[in-house]
C-alpha cells in the first residue's frame, strides 16, 4: 500500500502528536526505512520505459529551445556619455578621507580593467552578426549594425582603423596613447622634434614582417613594436618605408597618393601627408597585390580605401577602390527589384566610413572577430527596446578556458542580518552599469565584434549564395545580390535609417573600450567596483546604510526625511565620479526592501510575490506519475531551490530531485511527494535575522550516545545502534533545541555548524531542518565542550560552563563601519560629521 501524505507528515515528525523525540528521531536515520519510504514514494525508480515529458508549464528541457521573436519595431536604447573619472580614488578620498586597502585595491582593479586570455580564436567577419533570425536577415543586420554604431558613438567601442590604430568617441583616458595625424602623441612629453616623433609613429604602424634586422631594432612591448630612440632606428624607419615604396612603384598612382620625386617616400613630417595614411595605403597595396592565398585569408573584409579623405576622393580611379553601394549608381537596373533604384533615391549618401574623435595606438589587431552578436528583447517587461547579446563564450570553453575570479555573493542569512531592520529604503538604478568600467586598449584584440558588410552577409546567407569571387568589377557580380526580398527590406529600412544605409553596408571591426557583458570577468569587476563605492558611502554616512550587489544599489536611513537628504548627497557624489543614475527608475520601498528577489523587512526575509506566484503555477502544471526529463527538473529545482530556505524542510526536501538530475534520469512525481512539496511551498516562513548573545546550551555526541549541557543541568542518552558521528551530532543538536528551546547552541561538529543537512539520510535531514529552523550555532572546541563528558556517559564530572559570545555573520559582505546610534527625534540639521576615523575597524 503506497504511503499517504498524512502518514508521511507524521513520519517526518511535522505533526504535533509525535512521540518523544529521543525515540522517534534516531529512527529516521535508519537506512532501511529511508529506502522503503523512497520505494513507496516511487523516488528510487529512475529507469522508466514510458517516454519522458519535456515541458512543464514554461519550463522546457532537452530537444526544445524557445524560438526567439524578432521585433521589426525594436528601438535601439540610447546610452548616456558615460565617462568614469580617472582620479576616482582621489575624489573618494576628498569625500571620505583616506581609503582602506580593500577599497583602493578594488578601485584600482577597474581603472582600467585588464583582460588577457590564454588563447583567442579569431573568426571570419561573416560570423560577426549571427543569423539568429533567418526570416529577418537584412532587418536584423541593420538593427544590429545600428546598435553597434550607437555604442561606438557613446564611447563604449573602439573602431579598428588599421592593424595598429583605432578610433573612438568621447573623452580619452591617460592610458590610451593618442595618435595625432598618424603620430604618437603623449600628453605628458615635450615634443623634441618632428623627425623623431614621426619615426616613432612609423615604427608603430609599420608591419612587423619586414625582416629580422628591422625587428631587432625595435623592442617588443605589449602594445606592439616600439623603436629604440637613436639615429639608427630613425634611419631604419625611413628605409623601411623606401623598401616598401620600391616594391610596386606603379601601384601608388591608383591609390590617389603622389609619390615624391624619387619614388621613395620619405618619412619626415615635412613631405608626407600623414604616416597613418601611408601605412594604410601600403597596406591596401599589399593586400590587393600579393598572392591569392593572402587574399582568401584576409576575407576581403576590410575596405581600406576610406582611411583618409584624400583616398576617399579617388573612389572612381580603380575598380578595387570603388564602394559596392555607390557602384549601383552607374549601373543599369537589372530588374524592378534592382538595388540601383534605391541608390538613386539620394544624391549624397554620405561618407563610406565615419572617423572617431580620437585615434589611438593598439596592439596588432587582425581583421577578424572573436565573438558574434545578435539582438533580443531588452527584458521580459520591455519588448519595445532591444539588447545586444555578445557571445564571447569561447573564453569559457575548452582546455584554454579562462577561470574567472570568484567573488562573494551575500547569502540569504548574511543579507538578512545586514538589511533586516526598521530603516526606510530606496534603490538606485545605475544606467548601463557594465559600460562604466573602462578596459585597457591592450585587451581590444581579444574582444572584437563587427560585420563583413551587407553584400557578403546577404550573399553568404541567401539560398543562391554564389561563390564570392574577386571580380567585384563586373556588373554581373554586382547584381548577384539584387533580389525582391532585399529590395523590399532595404526600402522599408530606408525610412528608418536614410543615408546611414550606405554607412552600415560597409564592413566594420569594433573592439570593446568598456567591459562587455558576455565575459565572465565583467560581473566580477562590476561587483568589486560597486561594493567599493558603497563602502566609501557607508563610511561617509555612518548612521545610514548603503549596500550593493552588481548594479543594484540600495540606501537605507532611519526616517524618510533623513533618507531623502542622504539620497541627494549620495546622488551628487556618484555623479561627481562619473556614475550615471537613471532618476526615473529610483524606487522608494518604505520599510520593506525589495532586493535580489527577496522582500526584506524588520521581521526578516521572504521571497518576492512574483516568485511565489511562479511556484504556485509550477505546482499546478506539474504532472503526477509521468517521467519528467531531468533537464526540466533542473529548471524546477532552480525555482524551488530559491524559496527552499523559507519552507519547513528546506533543501533536504528536494534531494530526490537532485539525485535524478545527477544521474541524468527522468523523475516521476508520486501523488504523495507532490502533495508534500506543494504543502511545503504553500506556507513560507520568514528567515529572521540572527541576534548576538551568549551561548549557554551545548550538545555533543559519540557514535553510541549523546550529551547536553544546559546551564547547570546535564543530560545524556544512548542510541539503540551505533550511528555515523555526523548523524549522532545532528541528533544531539536537535535534542538540545527541543529540550531547552534555546536559539543558540554550542557544538564541535563542523557539518552541524554549516546548517546544511543535505548529506544526512533523507528523512532525518528533512525533520532536522524543521526542528533546527532559526537556530544559530557556535563552534566550541571538543576539549572545552561541557557536553563532552555526558556524551561519554560521565555525568559527575563538571567542566566549567563557557561564556561563548555569538556574533551574527554578515559573510564577506560586511565592509561596513560601526555606526553610532541615531537619536530618535530629528535634530534641526542632519549632522553628517563622521565619527569614523575613531570607530572604523577594518573587516
Curated annotation (Swiss-Prot):
<dbReference type="InterPro" id="IPR037531">
    <property type="entry name" value="HBV_DPOL"/>
</dbReference>
<keyword id="KW-0548">Nucleotidyltransferase</keyword>
<dbReference type="Pfam" id="PF00336">
    <property type="entry name" value="DNA_pol_viral_C"/>
</dbReference>
<dbReference type="GO" id="GO:0046872">
    <property type="term" value="F:metal ion binding"/>
</dbReference>
<dbReference type="InterPro" id="IPR001462">
    <property type="entry name" value="DNApol_viral_C"/>
</dbReference>
<dbReference type="Pfam" id="PF00242">
    <property type="entry name" value="DNA_pol_viral_N"/>
</dbReference>
<protein>
    <recommendedName>
        <fullName>Protein P</fullName>
        <ecNumber>2.7.7.7</ecNumber>
        <ecNumber>2.7.7.49</ecNumber>
        <ecNumber>3.1.26.4</ecNumber>
    </recommendedName>
</protein>
<keyword id="KW-0235">DNA replication</keyword>
<feature type="region of interest" description="Disordered">
    <location>
        <begin position="248"/>
        <end position="272"/>
    </location>
</feature>
<dbReference type="GO" id="GO:0003677">
    <property type="term" value="F:DNA binding"/>
</dbReference>
<feature type="domain" description="Reverse transcriptase">
    <location>
        <begin position="357"/>
        <end position="600"/>
    </location>
</feature>
<dbReference type="InterPro" id="IPR000201">
    <property type="entry name" value="DNApol_viral_N"/>
</dbReference>
<feature type="binding site">
    <location>
        <position position="552"/>
    </location>
    <ligand>
        <name>Mg(2+)</name>
    </ligand>
</feature>
<comment type="similarity">
    <text>Belongs to the hepadnaviridae P protein family.</text>
</comment>
<dbReference type="InterPro" id="IPR051320">
    <property type="entry name" value="Viral_Replic_Matur_Polypro"/>
</dbReference>
<feature type="region of interest" description="Terminal protein domain (TP)">
    <location>
        <begin position="1"/>
        <end position="177"/>
    </location>
</feature>
<keyword id="KW-0239">DNA-directed DNA polymerase</keyword>
<dbReference type="GO" id="GO:0003964">
    <property type="term" value="F:RNA-directed DNA polymerase activity"/>
</dbReference>
<keyword id="KW-0540">Nuclease</keyword>
<keyword id="KW-0511">Multifunctional enzyme</keyword>
<feature type="region of interest" description="Polymerase/reverse transcriptase domain (RT)">
    <location>
        <begin position="347"/>
        <end position="690"/>
    </location>
</feature>
<dbReference type="InterPro" id="IPR000477">
    <property type="entry name" value="RT_dom"/>
</dbReference>
<keyword id="KW-0945">Host-virus interaction</keyword>
<dbReference type="Pfam" id="PF00078">
    <property type="entry name" value="RVT_1"/>
</dbReference>
<dbReference type="GO" id="GO:0003887">
    <property type="term" value="F:DNA-directed DNA polymerase activity"/>
</dbReference>
<dbReference type="InterPro" id="IPR043128">
    <property type="entry name" value="Rev_trsase/Diguanyl_cyclase"/>
</dbReference>
<comment type="function">
    <text>Multifunctional enzyme that converts the viral RNA genome into dsDNA in viral cytoplasmic capsids. This enzyme displays a DNA polymerase activity that can copy either DNA or RNA templates, and a ribonuclease H (RNase H) activity that cleaves the RNA strand of RNA-DNA heteroduplexes in a partially processive 3'- to 5'-endonucleasic mode. Neo-synthesized pregenomic RNA (pgRNA) are encapsidated together with the P protein, and reverse-transcribed inside the nucleocapsid.</text>
</comment>
<keyword id="KW-1090">Inhibition of host innate immune response by virus</keyword>
<dbReference type="GO" id="GO:0004523">
    <property type="term" value="F:RNA-DNA hybrid ribonuclease activity"/>
</dbReference>
<keyword id="KW-0255">Endonuclease</keyword>
<keyword id="KW-0695">RNA-directed DNA polymerase</keyword>
<feature type="site" description="Priming of reverse-transcription by covalently linking the first nucleotide of the (-)DNA">
    <location>
        <position position="63"/>
    </location>
</feature>
<keyword id="KW-1113">Inhibition of host RLR pathway by virus</keyword>
<keyword id="KW-0238">DNA-binding</keyword>
<dbReference type="GO" id="GO:0052170">
    <property type="term" value="P:symbiont-mediated suppression of host innate immune response"/>
</dbReference>
<feature type="binding site">
    <location>
        <position position="429"/>
    </location>
    <ligand>
        <name>Mg(2+)</name>
    </ligand>
</feature>
<keyword id="KW-0899">Viral immunoevasion</keyword>
<dbReference type="InterPro" id="IPR043502">
    <property type="entry name" value="DNA/RNA_pol_sf"/>
</dbReference>
<keyword id="KW-0460">Magnesium</keyword>
<feature type="region of interest" description="Spacer">
    <location>
        <begin position="178"/>
        <end position="346"/>
    </location>
</feature>
<dbReference type="GO" id="GO:0006260">
    <property type="term" value="P:DNA replication"/>
</dbReference>
<keyword id="KW-0808">Transferase</keyword>
Amino acid at each position: 500500500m503506497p504511503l499517504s501524505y498524512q502518514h508521511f507528515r507524521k513520519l517526518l515528525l511535522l505533526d504535533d502528536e509525535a512521540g518523544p523525540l529521543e525515540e522517534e528521531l534516531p529512527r529516521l536515520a535508519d537506512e532501511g526505512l529511508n529506502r522503503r519510504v523512497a520505494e513507496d514514494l516511487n523516488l528510487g525508480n529512475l529507469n522508466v520505459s514510458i517516454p519522458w515529458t519535456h515541458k512543464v508549464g514554461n519550463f522546457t528541457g532537452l530537444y526544445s529551445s524557445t524560438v526567439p521573436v524578432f521585433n521589426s519595431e525594436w528601438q535601439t536604447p540610447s546610452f548616456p556619455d558615460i565617462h568614469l573619472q580617472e582620479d576616482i580614488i582621489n575624489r573618494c578620498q576628498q569625500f571620505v578621507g583616506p581609503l582602506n586597502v580593500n577599497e583602493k585595491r578594488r578601485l584600482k582593479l577597474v581603472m582600467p580593467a585588464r583582460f588577457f586570455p590564454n588563447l583567442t580564436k579569431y573568426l571570419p567577419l561573416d560570423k560577426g552578426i549571427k543569423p539568429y533570425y533567418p526570416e529577418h536577415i537584412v532587418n536584423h543586420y541593420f538593427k544590429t549594425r545600428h546598435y553597434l554604431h550607437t555604442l561606438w558613438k557613446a564611447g563604449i567601442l573602439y573602431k579598428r582603423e588599421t592593424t595598429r590604430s583605432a578610433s573612438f568617441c568621447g573623452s580619452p583616458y591617460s592610458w590610451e596613447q593618442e595618435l595625432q595625424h598618424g603620430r604618437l602623441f603623449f600628453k605628458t612629453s615635450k615634443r623634441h622634434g618632428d623627425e623623431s616623433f614621426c619615426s616613432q609613429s612609423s615604427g608603430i604602424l609599420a608591419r612587423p614582417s619586414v625582416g629580422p634586422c628591422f625587428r631587432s631594432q625595435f623592442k617588443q612591448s605589449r602594445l606592439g613594436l616600439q623603436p629604440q630612440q637613436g639615429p639608427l632606428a630613425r634611419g631604419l624607419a625611413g628605409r623601411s618605408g623606401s623598401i616598401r615604396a620600391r616594391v610596386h612603384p606603379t601601384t601608388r598612382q591608383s591609390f590617389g597618393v603622389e609619390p615624391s620625386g624619387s619614388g621613395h617616400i620619405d618619412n619626415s613630417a615635412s613631405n608626407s601627408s600623414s604616416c597613418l595614411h601611408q601605412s594604410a595605403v601600403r597596406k591596401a597595396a599589399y593586400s590587393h597585390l600579393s598572392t591569392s592565398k593572402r587574399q582568401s585569408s584576409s576575407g576581403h573584409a576590410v575596405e581600406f580605401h576610406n582611411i583618409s579623405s584624400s583616398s576617399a576622393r579617388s573612389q572612381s580611379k580603380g575598380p578595387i577602390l570603388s564602394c559596392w553601394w555607390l557602384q549601383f549608381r552607374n549601373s543599369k537596373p537589372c530588374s524592378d527589384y534592382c538595388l540601383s533604384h534605391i541608390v538613386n533615391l539620394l544624391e549624397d549618401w554620405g561618407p563610406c566610413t565615419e572617423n572617431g574623435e580620437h585615434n589611438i595606438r593598439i596592439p596588432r589587431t587582425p581583421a577578424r572577430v572573436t565573438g558574434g552578436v545578435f539582438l533580443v528583447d531588452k527584458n521580459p517587461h520591455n519588448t519595445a527596446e532591444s539588447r545586444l547579446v555578445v557571445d564571447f563564450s569561447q573564453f569559457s570553453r575548452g582546455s584554454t578556458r579562462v577561470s574567472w575570479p570568484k567573488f562573494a555573493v551575500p547569502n540569504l542569512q548574511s543579507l538578512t542580518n545586514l538589511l533586516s531592520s526598521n530603516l526606510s529604503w530606496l534603490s538606485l538604478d545605475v544606467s548601463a552599469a557594465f559600460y562604466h568600467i573602462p578596459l585597457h586598449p591592450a585587451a581590444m584584440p581579444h574582444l572584437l565584434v563587427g560585420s563583413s558588410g551587407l553584400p557578403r552577409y546577404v550573399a553568404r546567407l541567401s539560398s543562391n549564395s554564389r561563390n564570392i569571387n574577386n571580380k567585384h568589377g563586373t556588373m554581373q557580380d554586382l547584381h548577384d545580390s539584387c533580389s525582391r526580398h532585399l529590395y523590399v527590406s532595404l526600402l522599408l529600412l530606408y525610412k528608418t535609417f536614410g543615408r546611414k544605409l550606405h554607412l552600415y553596408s560597409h564592413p566594420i571591426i569594433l573592439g570593446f573600450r568598456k567591459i562587455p557583458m558576455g565575459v565572465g570577468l565583467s560581473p566580477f569587476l562590476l561587483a568589486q567596483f560597486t561594493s567599493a563605492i558603497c563602502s566609501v558611502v557607508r563610511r561617509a554616512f555612518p548612521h545610514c546604510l548603503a549596500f550593493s550587489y552588481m548594479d543594484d544599489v540600495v540606501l537605507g536611513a532611519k526616517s524618510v526625511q533623513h533618507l531623502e537628504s542622504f539620497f541627494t548627497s549620495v546622488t551628487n557624489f556618484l555623479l561627481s565620479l562619473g556614475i550615471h543614475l537613471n532618476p526615473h527608475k529610483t524606487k522608494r520601498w518604505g520599510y520593506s526592501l525589495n532586493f535580489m528577489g527577496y522582500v526584506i523587512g524588520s521581521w526578516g526575509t521572504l521571497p518576492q510575490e512574483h516568485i511565489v506566484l511562479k511556484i504556485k503555477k509550477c505546482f499546478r502544471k506539474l504532472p503526477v506519475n509521468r517521467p519528467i526529463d531531468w533537464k526540466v527538473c533542473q529548471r524546477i529545482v532552480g525555482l524551488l531551490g530559491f524559496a527552499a530556505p523559507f519552507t519547513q524542510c528546506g533543501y533536504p526536501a528536494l534531494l530526490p530531485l537532485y539525485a535524478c538530475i545527477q544521474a541524468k534520469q527522468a523523475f516521476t512525481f508520486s501523488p504523495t511527494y507532490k502533495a508534500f512539496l506543494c504543502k511545503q511551498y504553500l506556507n513560507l516562513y520568514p528567515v529572521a535575522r540572527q541576534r548576538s548573545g551568549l551561548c549557554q546550551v551545548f550538545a555533543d555526541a559519540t557514535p553510541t550516545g549523546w550529551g547536553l549541557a544546559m546551564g547547570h543541568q546535564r543530560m545524556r542518552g544512548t542510541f539503540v545502534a551505533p550511528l555515523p558521528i555526523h548523524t549522532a551530532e545532528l541528533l544531539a543538536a536537535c535534542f538540545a533545541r527541543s529540550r531547552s528551546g534555546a536559539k543558540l547552541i554550542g557544538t564541535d561538529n563542523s557539518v552541524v555548524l554549516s546548517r546544511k543537512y543535505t548529506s544526512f539520510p533523507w528523512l532525518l535531514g528533512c525533520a532536522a531542518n524543521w526542528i533546527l529552523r532559526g537556530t544559530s550555532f557556535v563552534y566550541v572546541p571538543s576539549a572545552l565542550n561541557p557536553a563532552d563528558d555526558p556524551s561519554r556517559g560521565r555525568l559527575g564530572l563538571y567542566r566549567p560552563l563557557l561564556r561563548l559570545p555569538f556574533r551574527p555573520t554578515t559573510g564577506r559582505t560586511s565592509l561596513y563601519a560601526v555606526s553610532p546610534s541615531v537619536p530618535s527625534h530629528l535634530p534641526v540639521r542632519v549632522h553628517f560629521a563622521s565619527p569614523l576615523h575613531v570607530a572604523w575597524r577594518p573587516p
